[in-house]
Amino acid sequence: MVMSRGRIPRLGAAVLVALTTAAAACGADSQGLVVSFYTPATDGATFTAIAQRCNQQFGGRFTIAQVSLPRSPNEQRLQLARRLTGNDRTLDVMALDVVWTAEFAEAGWALPLSDDPAGLAENDAVADTLPGPLATAGWNHKLYAAPVTTNTQLLWYRPDLVNSPPTDWNAMIAEAARLHAAGEPSWIAVQANQGEGLVVWFNTLLVSAGGSVLSEDGRHVTLTDTPAHRAATVSALQILKSVATTPGADPSITRTEEGSARLAFEQGKAALEVNWPFVFASMLENAVKGGVPFLPLNRIPQLAGSINDIGTFTPSDEQFRIAYDASQQVFGFAPYPAVAPGQPAKVTIGGLNLAVAKTTRHRAEAFEAVRCLRDQHNQRYVSLEGGLPAVRASLYSDPQFQAKYPMHAIIRQQLTDAAVRPATPVYQALSIRLAAVLSPITEIDPESTADELAAQAQKAIDGMGLLP
């Protein structure tokens, strides 16, 4: 899942998307050879821009036309699946959520990278790619996609309320209780509604505790199969329950998602938050607009004019520095809290991978398009202009990247030692069943919930459908 937000002005983005979608519809008859490039609508502007950059490099040999899928990941997956099962020959390159790799590979919908006629796809996908993103691109020891964007959650906190950021979840819960007793904002902002955000949170806690939902091959449930695995599952569940029931907890915690967590922090209700890096840009933008009571950036004269005509924060480099420097007194970031003290968390990552559809009529050009879309220059553009963390390790040493992402060192480390969600062709069913058992987190009984999670996970991999 990708939770970052783009930075291209929305009006221009809409025009670009419309033009490239029209080009894809026209097809090869009017445009020459066209490679379609299906991406989530949320990042359509960014992907349109890098497609156009590639088209300039190709010099007319062929063109890439970005086409927007729906905004909802579930609807994106369904549309691609329908096109592939219907043998849609206009489908060439697909931006796949990182959890779809096994499903698309097992179904034969995505070509293995070894099918690249030029023989370059596998090496290109591996070279300079961080280990976490790369781990999401394979199935059964074979690469089926090339990472193009990634994401990891951090701890965000109030330095004016918290002396030092908690390093583990026990310290998080203790700090929230201390703040509540002192009459200060005490919520821990999380994603705990019945959905993918809750599964991501649970998976991070589980893997950080030494456990896993499934075996590496996706064939066996490993939540309670050994005493050590059961202990890890119970530990993760205890943390979920404790966060929800500690004194001063968010009373609406069972309905929270990424957006409501961000808002709780910006409104001054939460002093601690685990969330994706999009909250950094959101905090600065809304503070400049006067919407963050504890961070009145709207009162800084040098930031005048940094909000454009459509309400987006588009600062100069100097304005960004001023806003960021001012924010540090009340808005900090730190590594994701550990489960075991002294052992860094293994944080579940999101992102997108590029795969070539089995239905493509232009195999060589589609694989070449993938290489261009994720090359060093376009990775830099995606990160700096699109607000999507890079998958290429070398970019984390780029001074401009570091300026745009002050938390770059934490992001890189967490992407190097990351957790991934269970690799299985039935991930959709597995996720739905896990979320149903975990929700509401206020009613978790760690021991019995561990058993129910294992039972529902087994039903998912046995092909018993989506409903618990």
UniProtKB/Swiss-Prot annotation:
Q: Which of this chain's residues are annotated to bind alpha,alpha-trehalose?
A: D97, N151, W276, F278, G351, R421
What GO MF terms are annotated?
trehalose transmembrane transporter activity
Uses = Being a receptor for trehalose, which is essential for the survival and virulence of M.tuberculosis, this protein is a potential target for antitubercular drug design.
Q: Tell me the SUPFAM superfamilies matching this sequence.
A: Periplasmic binding protein-like II (SSF53850)
- Keyword Transport included in the entry's annotation: yes
- Kindly state which keywords UniProt assigns to this record, in alphabetical order: Cell inner membrane, Cell membrane, Disulfide bond, Lipoprotein, Membrane, Palmitate, Signal, Sugar transport, Transport
Q: Which stretch is the leader sequence? A: 1-25
Q: Which GO terms describe its biological process?
A: biological process involved in interaction with host; trehalose transport
For the null mutant, the annotation states: Mutants show no growth on trehalose as the sole carbon and energy source, but grow normally on glucose. They secrete substantial amounts of trehalose during growth on glycerol.
User: What is any Pfam family matched here?
Assistant: SBP_bac_1
State whether keyword Ribonucleoprotein applies: no
A single GO cellular-component term from the record reads: ATP-binding cassette (ABC) transporter complex
Could you tell me which residues are lipidated, with the kind given as S-diacylglycerol cysteine? C26
* Top-rank taxon: Bacteria
Membrane topology according to the record: Lipid-anchor
InterPro entries from the entry? Answer: SBP
Question: Which cysteine-cysteine pairs are annotated as disulfide bonds in the entry?
Answer: C54-C372
Q: Please, where does N-palmitoyl cysteine lipid attachment map on the chain?
A: C26
Q: Which Gene3D superfamilies match?
A: Periplasmic binding protein-like II
Q: Where in the cell is it found?
A: Cell inner membrane
Which purpose does this protein serve, as stated in its record?
Part of the ABC transporter complex LpqY-SugA-SugB-SugC, which is highly specific for uptake of trehalose. Involved in the recycling of extracellular trehalose released from trehalose-containing molecules synthesized by M.tuberculosis. Trehalose uptake is essential for virulence. No binding affinity for maltose.
Subunit field text: Monomer. The complex is composed of two ATP-binding proteins (SugC), two transmembrane proteins (SugA and SugB) and a solute-binding protein (LpqY).
Q: Which family does it belong to?
A: Belongs to the bacterial solute-binding protein 1 family.
UniProt name for this protein: Trehalose-binding lipoprotein LpqY
Its lineage reads:
Bacteria, Bacillati, Actinomycetota, Actinomycetes, Mycobacteriales
- The gene from which this protein is expressed is lpqY
